[in-house]
């Protein structure tokens, strides 16, 4: 049972999503609708994109806490260029390039300069946030063109063009990780760095690629953010890095690297966003959101840790069982006889 849960974390996340629909649905039948599904998905698109990027980094046994600032910085560049008269495709392309460059810089710090990922990305978190504020002077960016907002308008089955793009991108990344040598390199790097090097995997380039892809996903998240709300606050992206990591952990991505899937991370992002919608239904104040999300994350971490310990004990038991010979019938009979004599003496 424990092994099944560990090997099917996506199913566990999906079950949690279903339960989180059923229980509120018992209180309000209108909650159980396709409209609710699409509404939560629309709200989860930003976090899903960030979770895809975080998956790539976490698979290599690293972590990036600068994606929130990268998202904000890229959103600001998009807004500045659009208000300066650049076309939407050009502005989006420049935004994507900026995100990839920001991620590449993180990767260089970690892979080539050997700075611990948490330290390097904490530094760039402040750097990218500072660049964002310098560009805007601390002001909000408003007056974005209608063409940008149109990207988030429903086009089919209540899902926007950006929503369909997010789904296709998630499926593509899931396929790349599961079915190609490119994806297996990420797992190998995170699972056994030295072993991957001996097999010829260019682990430094894999990690740089992971951070670069993460930056690209953060840029896409910035575009989605701007298109959904129609303006860019000066605190755009704040706190998103923790939610992205939480979504990955909820979906079964190991903090120790080398295991997990993009689909699990997507389901984790959906579940976290769904919690917010349930809190609204229950009329719980918004300031409880972070507390409850953190509580859920801690619960999952504790469960994940206990599950891993139980699996390791089971593996050790199976590994050394062949060295422990079972007792012979004569030994069993002698032990039983000795126990009976001991019981008589006590009586």
Curated annotation (Swiss-Prot):
Q: Which Pfam families match?
A: BPD_transp_2 (PF02653)
Q: Which organism is it from?
A: Salmonella typhimurium (strain LT2 / SGSC1412 / ATCC 700720)
Any one cellular-component term (Gene Ontology): plasma membrane
Q: What is expression of this protein induced or repressed by? A: In the absence of AI-2, repressed by LsrR. Induced by AI-2, via release of the LsrR repressor.
Name the domain of life: Bacteria
- A single MF term (Gene Ontology): transmembrane transporter activity
Q: Which family does it belong to?
A: Belongs to the binding-protein-dependent transport system permease family. AraH/RbsC subfamily.
What biological function has been recorded for the protein in this entry? Part of the ABC transporter complex LsrABCD involved in autoinducer 2 (AI-2) import. Probably responsible for the translocation of the substrate across the membrane.
Subcellular location, in the record's words?
Cell inner membrane
| Protein's membrane topology | Multi-pass membrane protein
User: Where does it mainly reside?
Assistant: membrane
NCBIfam families tied to this protein: PRK15432.1
PANTHER family reported for this sequence: ABC TRANSPORTER PERMEASE PROTEIN YPHD-RELATED-RELATED (PTHR32196), AUTOINDUCER 2 IMPORT SYSTEM PERMEASE PROTEIN LSRC (PTHR32196:SF29)
From the record, give the transmembrane residue ranges: 14-34, 39-59, 72-92, 93-113, 115-135, 155-175, 213-233, 249-269, 284-304
User: Could you tell me the keywords of this UniProt record?
Assistant: Cell inner membrane, Cell membrane, Membrane, Transmembrane, Transmembrane helix, Transport
Name recorded for this polypeptide: Autoinducer 2 import system permease protein LsrC
Please state the span of the N-terminal signal peptide per the UniProt entry: none
What assembly does the database describe for this protein? The complex is composed of two ATP-binding proteins (LsrA), two transmembrane proteins (LsrC and LsrD) and a solute-binding protein (LsrB).
